[in-house]
Amino acid sequence: MCCFVNLEYLKSFYMTVKHNNISKAAEILHLTQPGLSGQLKSLENELGVTLLIRSNKGVELTEEGKVVFDYADTLLSIQGNIKRDLVNLHQDRPKLLIGACKSVGEYALPCSIYTFKQHHKEVDIHMEVLNSTDVVEKLMDHTINIGIVQFRPKNDDILTKPIVSDELLLVGRSDSDNETSIKRISMGELKLIPLILREHNSGTFYVIEKALKSKGLHIEDLNVIYDLNSPEAIKSSILSGKGFSFLPRMAVEQELKKGNLQIVQIDDLKVCFKYYIISRKNYEYTEYEQMFIDFIISSKRGFC
């Protein structure tokens, strides 16, 4: 058995397991599928063991593969920390790489980032606004180091910390002359009104799907006319009288204050949820990353 392991091959193995799909991992790593398969085979040859069992359902770890995967997680985190710290040594300005779900990233965090920046002008801050699933993926790919999402990921390699509660509201256009201007409906009536939802891999979709299931209702039971991947696009549709949608209060606060949108109460359904800061299990925050997290968790965060 070889004493040295190729870290690139190890990363390819790690990504294949995380995505349970060779083609998906190859796409993310910018490799061809044969190229990725070759790297996996080379890693197995280096270690002298079989790591993966391939099937139509994806890949399955062998007992040896489970051991190597745990070490891969740790080693890749250490590698990321080394690269980050070496880069910081040769840069005058520390960096924050943040990924945030759209509800927080578009409506709340900009003001918080501004406030934090006012107190720490030496920091360069880069934030990507994505849906929650993509935030998790970029965190695990080491593209970002701090994530903020709309649900608690079911991943043992991710640490979560709740930061704030919110509520999903059913909203419609506030217009007494329009047929979409209603203020209260039953669960039965919910199945009839035209709905515009967020896309399937978004945190908002996950939260409402879970809430409806708790009441014995499924998305398929609803009159969903289309889905969009942008809260702003959904609000434009609602304001044009196209239908209703479930959106976080954080995303519709201004429209509610102005009276452009109104809340539609649903009998026996209140959908509350939390936003979470997420991090990789073996990742060590830099001084400024920890300062930013402490700030976001505190009452001084100053959400918009």
Predicted regions mapped to residue ranges:
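A short LG(V/I)-centered, amphipathic sequence patch enriched
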Residues: 44-61
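Short helix-boundary/capping micro-motifs
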Residues: 14-32
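Alpha-helical linker/hinge and terminal dimerization helices associated
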Residues: 46-47, 68-90, 303
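Central regulatory/effector-binding core of bacterial HTH transcription factors
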Residues: 93-156
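Secondary-structure junction motif
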Residues: 194-216, 286-287, 303
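Flexible hinge/capping segments at coil-to-helix
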Residues: 160-200
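Hydrophobic hinge/microswitch elements
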Residues: 131-136, 140-144, 149, 217-261
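A late-sequence structural motif
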Residues: 262-304
